[in-house]
Design a protein with these regions (language model features):
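A short, acidic, amphipathic alpha-helical segment used as a generic capping/interface helix at domain edges
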Residues: 37, 240-246, 284-304
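Acidic-and-aromatic substrate-binding clefts and catalytic sites of carbohydrate-active enzymes
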Residues: 17, 26-31, 54-69, 93-100, ...
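Acidic/histidine-rich catalytic cores of soluble enzymes
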Residues: 153, 159-277
Length: 343
């Protein structure tokens, strides 16, 4: 019998979408149905994934879908004995939303994406398929060049948009989590992310989503050398001292957690800007001891309302995503994280 039953173990559906498409050199998306089948097929010593997190956009989901269609999707997910956890709002330009530091029209698009996600979350909650999880957002401002032109003013624009988004979420009984990545302006370093979180100042509604791959590049100061906590050639002792410094700052805000691996590189595909490169769980070049690093983020997780953890491995080739061994290795890693740090 498994020694721990919480947090629940989820798989992300968006690796079937992110960086995929019909452009030159792109691979086609993998359908929600097939991603569910691949996830359901994974098994390690009789243990399975408990649920899924997913991105509320086409071709997986029309963010304007009718109640009837959304309930049909919930039934489809339930047919695999899965729960739904965290949902990704379509906040980016080219989906529904636009930059959180843009003009009034862009800001309204961003907020409309949050409203859509809250509506869908409420329908899933009412259906019974979703009993926990957050709605994931970020600044939706690709790159940091424009942000750098006036750091203080642009950070304030993001804070103001996030405050309005948090009020929308609160009215719907939902929580928002901003995912720190080096490619999103105002969220591209641990310090700038902390400035935004503290600027919003609504920890009960808007928190941080920590991803092991993306936060590794926070340590290295990839897009903010002035905030680097580590230099190349670091020792193991230096790594964990820096890791503790970063997690002590961001963990109190962390309400959603992505297990991931990174080899120290950045990667972009299709419409997705270069960001922390996700690697398979068993990648020999992985920089992270996944289980040990996860413990820094999952300390006191239950008290922050975390009820599940999710694997995130974006921009893998379809051949990797469609190989059963990929998901068994990931599930095995997730179980080891839960056995070490769960409850």
């Amino acid at each position: 019998m498994p020694s721990k039953s919480s947090p629940k173990i989820h798989n992300a559906m968006w690796p079937g979408l992110v960086g995929k498409g019909d452009g030159p050199g792109q691979e086609p998306p993998i359908s929600l149905e097939h991603m569910l089948e691949l996830t359901a097929a994974a098994s390690v010593n009789g243990q399975k994934f408990d649920g899924i997190d997913y991105f509320l956009f086409l071709p997986h989901t029309d963010p304007n879908a009718s109640d009837e269609e959304l309930n049909r999707i919930a039934d489809l997910i339930a047919s695999h004995s899965f729960s739904v956890g965290s949902l990704v709002a379509p906040v980016w330009p080219g989906t529904v939303g636009d930059s959180a530091m843009g003009d009034a029209a862009a800001k309204e698009k961003f907020l409309s994406a949050v409203r859509m996600a809250c509506r869908i979350a409420s329908i899933f909650d009412k259906h019974g398929i979703r009993k926990y999880g957050v709605i994931r957002i970020d600044s939706a401002e690709f790159g940091i060049e424009k942000w750098r032109q006036d750091k203080k003013a642009n950070t304030q624009l993001i804070v103001n948009t996030f405050k309005e988004a948090a009020k929308i979420a609160k009215d719907h009984g939902q929580r928002l989590a901003a995912e720190g990545e080096i490619c999103w302006a105002g969220m591209h370093s641990w310090k700038d992310m902390l400035d935004v979180l503290e600027g919003v100042g609504m920890p009960e509604v808007l928190g941080f989503q920590a991803d092991l791959a993306h936060t590794y590049l926070y340590l290295m100061g990839y897009n903010a050398p002035e905030h680097a906590l580590l230099q190349p050639g670091y020792t193991e002792a230096e790594f964990y001292a820096a890791y503790e410094t970063m997690t002590d700052k961001l963990r109190p805000w962390t309400i959603d957690f992505h297990v991931a691996q990174n080899d120290g590189q950045v990667h972009g595909a299709g419409a997705h800007d270069k960001t922390g490169k996700h690697c398979p769980a068993d990648d020999p070049n992985g920089k992270l001891d996944i289980v040990r690093c996860a413990g820094y983020w999952l300390k006191d997780a239950a008290s922050r309302g975390i009820k599940h953890i999710c694997w995130d491995g974006c921009m893998f080739p379809n051949a990797t995503l469609e190989t059963p061994a990929t998901w068994n290795s990931i599930l095995d890693t997730m179980i080891r994280v839960r056995d070490a740090h769960g409850w």
